[in-house]
Amino acid sequence: MQAEGRGTGGSTGDADGPGGPGIPDGPGGNAGGPGEAGATGGRGPRGAGAARASGPRGGAPRGPHGGAASAQDGRCPCGARRPDSRLLELHITMPFSSPMEAELVRRILSRDAAPLPRPGAVLKDFTVSGNLLFMSVRDQDREGAGRMRVVGWGLGSASPEGQKARDLRTPKHKVSEQRPGTPGPPPPEGAQGDGCRGVAFNVMFSAPHI
């Protein structure tokens, strides 16, 4: 009888813990699936109920406006994300011989950038300052930590001479630039593109355990 009383007390305390009525936005808060009902109704351990709420049967936690919630602010600008997915971001600075060449590359790369965030799309942003091109790439690691996804870009460079492939390495990312010497897309109006050559960037995202 004494052990039974302790079990009942644990269930009652559970309702006031994380995910109970005391925290409206917790895993067992507002409106939810069967997992949330199990957590607040005392039919099973709180941990198992919370796992069901975010699992395949309970669905992803919902934000205040009905969208998939993220750990930071309850919103995900890129659409629904799996609980085990992470958003990977990569910044690249590429110097060119002149501001016109950097602007030429920015215009060509911007054609491939999605105007609005879409689920599963790679988000790319390009900015020019002088002869420097700043590239920002964001992708969602849907396969879990440690997996890689390759993103390819095709662009034209105003440089008349081809260059050997080179690697830019950081502790987490590897970026390869290749100039195969094939003709690239036509340059924008006003640019000197007589020696335009094809350039391809391969960005490999890796998410090692930290």
From Swiss-Prot:
A single GO cellular-component term on record: centrosome
Q: Extract the Pfam families matched here.
A: Pcc1
In which tissues is this gene expressed? Testis and very low level in placenta and in some uterus samples. Observed in 25-50% of tumor samples of melanomas, non-small-cell lung carcinomas, bladder, prostate and head and neck cancers.
Spans annotated as Disordered? 1-80, 154-197
One GO biological process term = tRNA threonylcarbamoyladenosine metabolic process
Basic and acidic residues compositional bias, start-end: 163-177
Q: Please give the InterPro entries that the UniProt record associates with this protein.
A: CTAG/Pcc1
**What's the superkingdom here?**
Eukaryota
**Compositional bias ranges of the Gly residues kind:** 1-47, 56-66
**Which family is it part of?**
Belongs to the CTAG/PCC1 family.
Q: What is this protein called?
A: Cancer/testis antigen 2
Gene of this entry: CTAG2
